[in-house]
Amino acid sequence: MNDLCTDIGYKSINHYGEQLCGDHVDVVESGENSTVIVLADGLGSGVKASILSTLTSKIISTMMAEGLPLEECVSTIAATLPVCSSRGVAYSTFTIVHVINNESAELIQYDNPHVILIRDEEYYDYPKTEMNIDGKKIYKSVLKLREND
């Protein structure tokens, strides 16, 4: 154990003219020393984007918090979410940050811009492993956390 703590904050802003936000963040405590944070981004904006991003973040955060394997979580999402017929992309993308004991973080990223990590006041290019799960390109990273990351 260490003296680090995780500070989690976010702000969702609706697209101009929309009543709902197409992004959704879900934070779930998983046991005493584990937190799962999921950012899901629904394609476009409005009701459809909001529903799909909420569905995505809720399914993933619940499954990850219950300790299910990454492959099963992604397979479930891939089977659940529709694919845009004109663009051929999923209607929702996601980034997962799984913080364990405030010591390490597992980053799992699908089709979102990569997480930007600032370490020692500079951009830190952390290692990423590319995985293919059910035809989806997933990036996974495991990081040892440091003060002020």
Per-region residue spans from a language model:
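Membrane-embedded alpha-helical signal segments
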Residues: 29-35, 48, 56
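Catalytic core of PPM/PP2C metal-dependent serine/threonine phosphatase domains
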Residues: 21, 52-121, 132, 138-140
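Acidic loop->beta-strand submotif enriched in PP2C/PPM serine/threonine phosphatases
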Residues: 18-31, 125-149
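Regulatory cytosolic signal-relay segments
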Residues: 1-19
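Short acidic, Gly/Ser-rich segments with clustered Asp/Glu that frequently serve as metal-coordination loops
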Residues: 16-17, 42-50
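Conserved beta-strand-loop-short alpha-helix elements that form
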Residues: 33-45, 109, 142-149
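Beta-strand-turn-beta hairpins that frame and shape the catalytic cleft
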Residues: 3-6, 31-34, 101-105, 145-148
